[in-house]
Amino acid sequence: MKPTSTGGRPVSPDAETVTASDVGRELRRLRKAAGETQAETARIIGVTRANLTQWETAKYLPSAHNARQLDDHFRAANALFKLVEKARSPQEHAAPAAGDAGVVDTSRSLLQVFHTVGAKLAEHLIHDADGKPLGWRHNLQKNTGPKALSTAYGINTMLVVGDPYIDLHTLSEDLYRLQSAHGWRGRAGGKRPETTASVVDALFRTSTLSADEGLERLEGSLDPYSRTRPYLLSAVLHTAVRLRPDAPLTDRLIDALLAARLDFDGSRLWPEKNEAGLVAPEASVVHTARSVVALRDVLRSREDRNDVREAADEATQWLIDRSHSDDGVAEDLERPRPDGEGTTRIIIRHFTAAWVVQALANAPRLPLPRLNRALGTLWERYDADQGLWVWGSGDLPIWQTLDAVTALRAAALAVAVPPLSPPGTP
C-alpha cells in the first residue's frame, strides 16, 4: 500500500512504503494549510528557499534536524518527522538494479551530478590574458585571484569526478613552482601543513611530484603545534598514506593522531584540539570522522597496526550512535606569524556530513539508516542551479564540493549491489 495525499488529507507515515515524493507532498500540504509561502517557512526553519523547494519537489529529504524543526513548526505531532525518517530508511521500493528489466532515469543520477560539477568548475577556472589557466579562488563567487590551496582542491575535485575538462598538467606544473622553503603556504603565510598536504596530494596524483619529495615536503611543514590538532594530523596522514603507507613519517603521524584522543565516558575519541589547560572539551564529530577516514586509509595498506583498527572501530561505533545532526562547524587555528610577531588566526570550516559519510562508507559493516541521515544533510547543501555545494552563509567554497563528491563516490561504491558488485555479495 502506498500513501496518497489528495486535497487536505495527510500522508500517513504508517504506510508500507514512503518516498521522498510523499514527504514533499505532505510538506507542501502543511505549508499551505499554515498559509505560508516557501520563503516564509524557509526563514522560520533557518534554511534557504532553494532548500525548501528541493524538499517539496522530492529532490532531497530534510535532515533529521530540519525534519524535527519542520514537525515542531507545523505542530505535526511527530508525524512529519516519522514520515521523513521512513522515507530515508531502506525499503522494498528501491530502484531497480542495472540488470533488471526496468529502465532507470539517469537525468538526476550521481553520474550526471559529477559531470555537472566538472563543467561548473571548468567555468570557474581563472585564466590570464593569454588564456592560460591559473587556478581557482577559494570562494568561487568572489572576484579574487587564484590560491595554491584552492587550486589543489580544484585539481583533486576534477580527479574525483573523472572529467577533467581542462589541462591539469599545466595547472599542476604551475602549482609546483609556488612552493616555498616550508612547502606551500596559505593566505596567512608560515607553515601550513594542511595546505602542503592538499597540494602534495594533487601533485602526486597528477605525476608532478615524486613520493620521496612529497614526504620531505610534508615533514618540513609540521611543527609541535600540529600535534595538538587532529585536523592537521589527519590531513597530513591522509596524504602520507597515499605516498608511502610504510614510511617512517606515516608511522609517526599515526602515533601522533592516536595520542591526540581524549577519554569521553570510556570512549577514546578526537576533540577539536588536545592541549594543556582545556576546560571540559567535547568530542568532535567532524574531527573524529576525519581521523577515522585517515586511519581506514592506513588499514587498506597495513595489517600490522591492530591499535589503528581498534581505534577506528571504536570511533566509528560512536559516530553510528550519534543522534544529532551532522551540521558544518568552524575551527580556529592560531598559527605563529612568519616574522615572529605574534600569531595569525585562521578560520577552518568543516563539512561534517561529508566526513561522516566517508567514515561510515569505509566501515566493515555499513549502517544504512545512519548513512542515509548523513547523506540527507550533505544533499541539503547542494545547489542544483550552481551545480556545486553551498555553505550556509551563501559562499561557494571549492573545498566543500571536493568533500561532497569524495564522500558520494565512497558511499556509492560501498552500497553497490550485484550486478555492480561481485555475485553473492549480501
Regions found by a protein language model. Give the residues of each.
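A short, Lys/Arg-rich alpha-helix, primarily the initiator
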Residues: 1-34, 81
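Intrinsically disordered or compositionally simple regulatory linkers and C-terminal tails
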Residues: 5-7, 14, 90-101
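Short alpha-helical segments in extracytoplasmic peptidoglycan/chitin-binding modules
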Residues: 31, 71, 175
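Short alpha-helical DNA-recognition segment
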Residues: 32-54, 60, 64
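DNA major-groove recognition helix of helix-turn-helix/homeodomain DNA-binding modules
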Residues: 63-86
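Preference for long, amphipathic alpha-helical scaffolds in soluble/luminal domains
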Residues: 94-426
